[in-house]
UniProtKB/Swiss-Prot annotation:
One of its GO terms (cellular component) is plasma membrane. One of its GO terms (molecular function) is transmembrane transporter activity. The chain crosses the membrane at residues 22-42, 51-71, 101-121, 126-146, 154-174, 179-199, 227-247, 258-278, 286-306, 309-329, 347-367, 369-389. Signal peptide: none annotated. It comes from Burkholderia pseudomallei (strain 1106a). HAMAP family: MFS_YhhS. It is found in: Cell inner membrane. It is a multi-pass membrane protein. This is Uncharacterized MFS-type transporter BURPS1106A_3201. Keywords: Cell inner membrane, Cell membrane, Membrane, Transmembrane, Transmembrane helix, Transport. Its main location: membrane. It comes from the Bacteria.
Length: 407
């Protein structure tokens, strides 16, 4: 075996050390999304039942966070590129703590509904900004610590931290609000953000990357095809997250929550076991296979005659969706100079925010007009379009590589 080939196969110890370096910074993403997940399932009931507002107002008060995240993506990318990932994460955690203080105030002013809802909306807006800063900063911090060769692993672990925290946070938040009082959630958000801020300060920053910085508009244009692919793939996740329980209820099937569990389990399992395939086979090839699995799973949900088939469909969808973000994300980030990686990552992530924001209302229209199964058929068509788009991008990349080699 040559020295080059020996070096290309990391030892178990070096692989573990790399993973440890990644986890040490994406843990701040976990903390950030815990502050999001803890009050998430409690707030709609608080706004509707305690404050007396309509379900529409309750939904809007929760959803405003996602618009804040979307609007602050350019800010997060610029901060990560110019201030550095560590300072970006610290600012994001500070915003999470501030959102906790505003949330605590909203609970304290529950006797005055108008004041309480204003404080709650302010809390959600600040939390959305914090989510954007921490999510972008943590990924770039991880890449800076382990090198660009491990981009896919960093993005994959960051996603595990994100969905893991949301899965844990929501039920824990409900349990705490029932056992104690909802105001405790505000205190817990402040405490978690403070803990994250303290721990983040202890970790060494990575050097700023100097060099050419592209304008955000130029970066957005460059990653547009990859972002469209991400949006197509996210439609399946959005459809399952929003409508799987209603789909089960319409068919009088039990255990709708189990389908969400298997979706999440296969999602995390795929990221843990197969993230390295992106480095080995390239992002586009992995994306093509991932979209195909997602499409197959969504078609099974559409046609499922019994709950067991729907369960397999949810599992395949989670398995397929798992690697779409990192697979296309690695290719998107590679298109820009190193000094613009933060902008590329934030611009690419915008399409996830947009897709999840648009999928709900569109899928709701489809469900009302044609029935719940057709929601998953439409998502399957989107995944099939993702296969086609990824194939075109892969072929274009191969042509460019071939012409470059010939030159």
């Amino acid at each position: 075996m040559s020295a080059d080939s020996a070096d290309s196969v990391p030892s178990p110890r070096s692989a573990f050390a790399t993973t440890l370096q990644i986890v040490s910074v994406v843990s701040f993403t976990f903390i950030c999304y815990l502050t999001i997940g803890l009050p998430l399932a409690v707030l709609p009931g608080f706004v509707h039942d305690e404050l007396g507002f309509s379900a529409i107002v309750a939904g809007a008060a929760i959803s405003v966070q996602y618009f804040a995240t979307l609007a602050s993506r350019p800010l997060a990318g610029r901060c990560a590129d110019t201030l550095g990932p560590k300072r970006t994460v610290l600012r994001g955690l500070a915003a999470c703590g501030a959102s906790g203080a505003l949330l605590l105030s909203a609970f304290a002013f529950a006797r005055w509904p108008a004041a309480s809802i204003v404080l709650l909306v302010a809390s959600r807006l600040v939390l959305g900004i914090g989510e954007s800063l921490v999510g972008t900063g943590a990924i770039l911090w991880g890449i800076g610590r382990v090198g660009t060769a491990h981009n896919a692993r960093v993005i994959s672990w960051n996603g595990i931290a994100t969905y893991g925290a949301l899965a844990i946070g929501a039920p824990v938040g409900v349990a705490i609000s029932h056992a104690l009082i909802p105001a405790v959630l505000g205190m817990l958000v402040i405490a978690l953000a403070a803990l994250g801020y303290y721990l983040a300060r202890l970790i060494t920053p990575v050097p700023l990357v100097h060099g050419e910085r592209m304008s955000y508009a130029s970066v957005l244009t460059r990653v547009l095809p990859h972002g469209l692919g991400l949006a197509l793939g996210s439609a399946g996740f959005g459809s399952i997250a929003t409508f799987i329980t209603l789909y089960y209820a319409a068919r009088h099937w039990p255990n709708a929550a189990l389908s969400l569990t298997v979706f999440g389990t296969l999602f995390i399992g795929a990221r843990l076991l197969f993230a390295n395939t992106i480095k080995t086979h390239g992002g586009f090839r992995v994306a093509i296979v991932s979209f195909a699995f997602e499409c197959a799973g969504l078609l099974m949900l559409w046609l499922a005659p019994v709950p067991h088939v729907a369960l397999v469909g949810a599992a395949l969808t989670g398995f397929g969706f798992a690697l779409i973000f990192p697979a296309l994300g690695v290719e998107a980030v590679a298109l820009v100079p190193p000094a613009s990686r933060g902008a590329a990552l934030s611009a690419y992530s915008v399409f996830l925010d947009l897709s999840l924001g648009i999928t709900g209302p569109l899928a709701g229209y489809v469900a009302g007009a044609f029935g719940y199964p057709q929601v998953f058929l439409c998502a399957a068509v989107a995944a099939a379009a993702g296969v086609a788009l990824s194939t075109v991008l892969y072929q274009r990349q191969a042509r460019l590589s071939g012409s470059g080699a010939a030159a």
